[in-house]
Structure formats: C-alpha cells, structure tokens
UniProtKB/Swiss-Prot annotation:
Function: Catalyzes the transfer of the enolpyruvyl moiety of phosphoenolpyruvate (PEP) to the 5-hydroxyl of shikimate-3-phosphate (S3P) to produce enolpyruvyl shikimate-3-phosphate and inorganic phosphate.
Name of the gene this protein is made from: aroA
Residue positions of the active site: D288
Name of the protein in question: 3-phosphoshikimate 1-carboxyvinyltransferase
Enzyme's top EC category: transferase
Family stated for the protein in its record: Belongs to the EPSP synthase family.
Length: 410
C-alpha cells in the first residue's frame, strides 16, 4: 500500500501526541522488576510497547518481539535475571541485528544465554537465574539500549552493578533518562565519574507513574512548522523540563525558523522568521532525529553536515543509505563518511516526477518524509503502516491538520 499526500497552504492544529515510547518501555521493565501492582499509566499504544506488555504479562516460553529492537534488548537482560526458561525471537530483520555485546556483558554477570541459530544474533535461549557478577566494562559508543538494559537490572543483582564506559559515550541523554526513571522507582543509581555508573543492590519500589508525551513524535510537527509557509500548532502533554533527550530538538529547530512557546498543557509552535544559512550539528545524543533534520534542511535549501550518526546503520534499516537513496529521488545528493557523517553541500540532480519513498520497514523514514508533501505535492509514501511502531495515529493526526491522504497506485 502507498499513501499519496497533499498539504494545506497553512497549518493550524491541536495535536495530542502519543506517550513516550522510550519512557513507556523503561517503565514497564522497571515495574516488572519491582513486582508491584501499580502499572504505569498513559503507556504508549505503539507496536514496540504493546509487544513489551504482551511479553511481560503472558509469560510465554517463546517470545516473539517482531521488529521491536528496544524490547529485544531490554527483555534479554530482564529474562536473564528472572527465573524461567524462554526463547526470544523476532522478524527476519531483527535476526540480522547484532546483540553479542549485550549477551557477552550479561554472561559476565553470570547469565545463561545460548544462540539458537547464528552466533551473535537472535533468536536467544535464556535460562533466567540470580546473577552474582557486578562489574562490567563496555565501550561508550555501543547502543545506549545495551547500557540501559544492564542498568535497569542492576538493583536486582545480588551485588549491584558497577558499569564502566570507555571512550566517547553516545546517546548519553538516553542513559540519563534510564537513571532518572530508576531513581523515580526507588533505585540508587548514579554517575560516580564521567565514565562510571554505580547501581546499588537496592530493590525497586512500585509507585504510581504517568508517562509523558513523546518528544520524538513532536519532531515531525516541528518539521511541518519549519516547511510550511504559515503554521500554528499546539502539541499537548510535553514538558519544558523533560526527561527525554529528544526535547533538544526544539533548540535546533529554532535555528530553522520554529519558535516554541510553553503553555499549561504543552507547547505551541509558530514561525520565528529566521533560518540559518547552514546547519552543522552533532547527533550523537539525538540519533532518532537525524532523518527529520536531513529532510527538513534539504527542503529549506540549508546545507548541512551531521556527525555522530554511527548508530544509524544498525537501526530498523541502514538509515544512512536509506536517506541517500530516497533523498536522491527528491533531487538531493547526500554524501556520507566513516559511517557516522552525513552531509549535503547543495548538490542537486533532476528530481523524480512522482517520487515514491521507500520506508524499509522503518517508521522514522515514513514520518520524516511525509512532511515533504508541503514541497512535493505528488510524493507517495510506501508501506505507510510502519508508523505503528512508534506513532500509530500519525496519519490521522496529519488529516486533522489538513493534509490530504489517499491510497496511491502501486
């Protein structure tokens, strides 16, 4: 299926954003480890979170997390520290995503994990048990989800956890998000130096908890505001002082012409009348916003150089290659370097007359390219249903904002 999109001449809308996927998934694991009754409220309705809920509540011996990478990593650590024998698997793409770094770390703590098929990749057979190890050293540039997975089980380890990170630490805000949520549930977990984290063997407390709205989802509305001639967009459920690292996107979008006003219910986006001539930005802490800013900058004719993108190659797809391929359809030639830098210097080619954007089973490809309809009235998005992974109501919300969406021709 494809969606053919058309955009209104001006955007005026109030949008209730989905709950944060990042917070929901962490809160669910911590709640399960607390063994309490107060289930977190306002959980995300996205695929990833629903997969997590099913895995934690049904207790099946074989757990299929489909395409949910967060669930694969968090559940691998959770199941390793919880009595029981389980096999955890996923889609074909999930079985191609490496997990050896996390498995090796868990084995150092005493976990019993076997690879069912290919060494270093899911599916995994996990025999949960009490883990007695307490010291782990990891490179700081590994996925922050590996680090978060280990941190969250720290309080239930017999001797707690001392985690040392070497070299550059990527996605530090996601690590801080995990630590803050752990503290909210009564854990003693903190940085003891710039590279070391200490988690004491202190049980979680089950407490009432409400999940805030998703700043990652907000980024697509910032993008729409930046690309639209006129925009007045209210987004509810967002906080000025958010746990989410992606809230930094507001600062970056301010340089691309979008002003943020904080209100009692959330935020209001308007044009601020200014836009930089070039954007150089390090995305090491906000990798999930990279696709949004690539499309936005190019369509605003703002050359850019984005660094810190090393984690993009192991996401739902190789996002660097996907961006280069799909942006070329719109007439933009991007260049990458060292698997971590993506740039556009203004180089153009003839655009396709009716571009069809391939989404590669990646929700963020669909949502980052859909706002391009403001500049490309014939654009089509392939496999639009992929947005259910993080923002199931995305297309309905676009309709509320005045976008035309109809099923395109295959």
């Amino acid at each position: 299926m494809r969606y053919l999109l058309s955009a209104p001449s001006q955007i005026k809308a109030t949008i209730q954003l989905p709950a944060s996927k990042s917070i929901s998934n962490r809160a669910l694991i911590i709640h399960a480890l607390s063994k309490g009754d107060d289930v977190p409220s306002n959980l995300s309705d996205c695929d990833d979170t629903q997969v997590m809920i099913k895995a934690l509540t049904e207790g099946n011996e074989v757990i299929d997390i489909l395409a949910a990478g967060t669930a694969m990593r968090f559940l691998t650590a959770y199941l390793s520290s919880t009595p029981g024998i389980h096999t955890i698997t996923g889609t074909e793409r999930m079985q191609q995503r490496p997990i050896q770094i996390l498995v090796n770390a868990l084995r150092e703590l005493g976990a019993h994990i076997e690879y069912v098929r290919n060494e270093g990749f899911p599916p995994l057979r996990i025999e949960g048990r009490e883990l007695t190890g307490s010291e782990i050293t990891l490179k700081g540039n590994v996925s922050s989800q590996y680090i978060s997975a280990l941190l969250m089980i720290g309080p239930v380890l017999k001797n707690g956890l001392q985690l040392r990170l070497t070299g550059e630490i990527v996605s530090r805000p996601y690590i801080n998000l995990t630590l803050q949520l752990m503290k909210d549930f009564g854990a003693s977990a903190s940085w003891t130096s710039d590279q070391n984290i200490q988690v004491d063997p202190q049980p979680y407390h089950c407490l009432p908890f409400t999940v805030e709205s998703d700043w990652s989802a907000a980024s697509y509305w910032y993008q729409i505001a930046a690309l639209s001639p006129q925009a007045d967009i209210e987004l509810t459920g967002l906080f000025r002082h958010s746990y989410q690292g992606d809230s930094r996107g507001a600062e970056v979008f301010a340089r691309l012409g979008v002003a943020t006003e904080y209100t009692e219910t959330g935020i209001r986006l308007k044009k601020n009348g200014t836009c930089v001539e070039r954007l150089d930005e390090d995305f090491v802490d906000i990798p999930d916003l990279a696709q949004t800013f690539v499309v936005t900058c190019a369509l605003l004719n703002v050359p850019f150089r984005f660094t810190g993108l090393q984690s993009l190659k192991i996401k739902e797809t190789d996002r660097i290659e996907a961006l280069k391929t799909e942006m070329k359809k719109l007439g933009y030639i991007l260049h990458d370097k060292n698997d971590s830098i993506l740039s556009w210097d203004g180089e153009r080619v003839e655009q396709q007359t009716c571009p069809v954007i391939k989404t590669y089973e990646d929700h963020r490809m669909a949502m980052a390219f859909a706002p391009a309809a403001i500049h490309y009235p014939t654009i089509q998005i392939d496999e639009p249903q992929v947005v259910s992974k993080s923002y199931p109501g995305y297309w309905d919300d676009l309709r509320k904002a005045g976008f035309g969406i109809k099923v395109g021709e295959e």
